[in-house]
Each structure stands twice: as structure tokens, then as C-alpha cells.
């Protein structure tokens, strides 16, 4: 499965859940297209799609917690009240929110759509959804 990516560099932290480039690199690592047996391997690979986000402490090298849909709704209220800095990272399909001490990411509908496209493009075994009960209903729309 290809999710739960986190790469921390002191001067260049990365707070994304599962960058598209990393998903492709991971699949390419395991699949050698010149090898006939690669077809059998591709059928076993799933792109993991998390229906949750993460909170990262800015001073830490790992996530400090999972963000569920109900928690994200509270965070959205903070954005509406101008309590937090927010932007959406369209290329990856993620919301990124800076709360001061933490950075929070959460998937957008586009996050799901992009990973479904990659699954078809790379002709792999399919997808695996993680945490269905914690996601926002809009995340199911692409299916």
C-alpha cells in the first residue's frame, strides 16, 4: 500500500500524506516493466487511500496524530474565524493548515480522484481505503 509518507528535513519539512510522485516511485521500484513476471506483481499492488488526515508538530519528525472528519470540521471553523493559515495543495489534492505549533493535512475529493486515475494509468491491482468510518462523505463521491 502506498500511503503514510512523511519525510522530515529540518529546513524543508514535507507534511503530505502520500505524494503522487512518491506513489509512482514506489510502484516503479517494485515493478520492472522489462521483466515478464512484473505483470503478476502489478496485480498485487494497491494504492492506499487514507480517509483521514494527520497533525504534525513542527518540531517533530513524525505525525503527532490522526485527524478525523469531525476534528477536521472543527479545524474548518477555525479557518472561517481566521484562527489558522490555510491553503489547498491542488497538485496533491490536500488541505494544509498551519495552526501555529502544528501543520495539519487532510485529503480533498481531488486527492481521491488523482489516486484513482493513477491506479488505472499504471494498471495495478487496485486501491485500498483506510479508515472509511472517519472520512468526510465527500471523499466517497469519486467512487
Predicted regions mapped to residue ranges:
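Substrate-binding surface in catalytic domains of secreted glycosidases
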Residues: 1-76
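Flexible, active-site-adjacent loop/turn segments at secondary-structure boundaries
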Residues: 3, 102, 130
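Solvent-exposed, flexible loop/coil residues
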Residues: 7-9, 108-110, 136
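Stable alpha-helical elements in mature extracytoplasmic
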Residues: 19-30, 108-115, 139
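Extracellular/periplasmic catalytic domains that process cell-envelope and extracellular macromolecules
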Residues: 38-41, 97-98, 120-122
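Glycan-binding loop/region signatures in secreted carbohydrate-active enzymes
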Residues: 46-117
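Acidic/aromatic/glycine-rich contiguous surface patches that form carbohydrate-binding/processing clefts
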Residues: 111-143
Amino acid at each position: 500500500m502506498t500511503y503514510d509518507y512523511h519525510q522530515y528535513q529540518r529546513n524543508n519539512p514535507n507534511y503530505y500524506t502520500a505524494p503522487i510522485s512518491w506513489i509512482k516511485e514506489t510502484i516503479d521500484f517494485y515493478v520492472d516493466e522489462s521483466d515478464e513476471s512484473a505483470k503478476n506483481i502489478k496485480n498485487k499492488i494497491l494504492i492506499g487511500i487514507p480517509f483521514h488526515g494527520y497533525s504534525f508538530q513542527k518540531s517533530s519528525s513524525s505525525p503527532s496524530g490522526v485527524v478525523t472528519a469531525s476534528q477536521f470540521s472543527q479545524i474548518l471553523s477555525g479557518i472561517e474565524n481566521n484562527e489558522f493559515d490555510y491553503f489547498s495543495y491542488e497538485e496533491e489534492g490536500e488541505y494544509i493548515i498551519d495552526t501555529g505549533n502544528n501543520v495539519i493535512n487532510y485529503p480533498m475529493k481531488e486527492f481521491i480522484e488523482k489516486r484513482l486515475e493513477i491506479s488505472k494509468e499504471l494498471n495495478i491491482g487496485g486501491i485500498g481505503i483506510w479508515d472509511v468510518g472517519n472520512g468526510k462523505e465527500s471523499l466517497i463521491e469519486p467512487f
